[in-house]
């Protein structure tokens, strides 16, 4: 992945918990799990109003069975015997790059926000 440019208005930021952020940045977690089918492309990785990295996400993979969920475990690393969402999607992480910056988002924002 080319060096990320400074954040622009409208850039997408995935809001993550600290554990998942660390696993993605280390390269151990290669699939993010979401309840929505996010578009492929560039996303910044955010935690507590800071940017820690940038990823390129591939086309979303619908996860519809427990067997598929278990097979994908080495990529998503979510330790659960059931699907986490009624509609579950795996977002393949094609590349990741660490960086730091700050951003603000609306109070209580979860999941994904756009840079303002």
Q: What are the functions of these language-model segments?
A:
Residues 2-116:
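Structured alpha/beta reader/binder surfaces that contact nucleic acids or chromatin modification marks
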């Amino acid at each position: 992945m080319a060096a990320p440019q400074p954040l622009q208005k409208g850039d997408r930021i995935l809001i993550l918990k600290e554990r998942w952020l660390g696993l993605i940045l280390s390269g151990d977690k290669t699939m993010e799990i979401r309840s929505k089918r996010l578009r492929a492309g560039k996303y910044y990785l955010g935690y507590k109003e800071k940017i820690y990295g940038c990823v390129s996400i591939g086309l979303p993979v619908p996860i519809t069975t427990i067997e598929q969920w278990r097979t994908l475990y080495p990529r998503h690393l979510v330790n659960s015997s059931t699907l986490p969402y009624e509609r579950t999607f795996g977002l393949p992480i094609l590349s990741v790059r660490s960086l730091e910056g700050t951003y603000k988002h609306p109070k209580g924002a979860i999941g994904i926000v756009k840079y303002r």
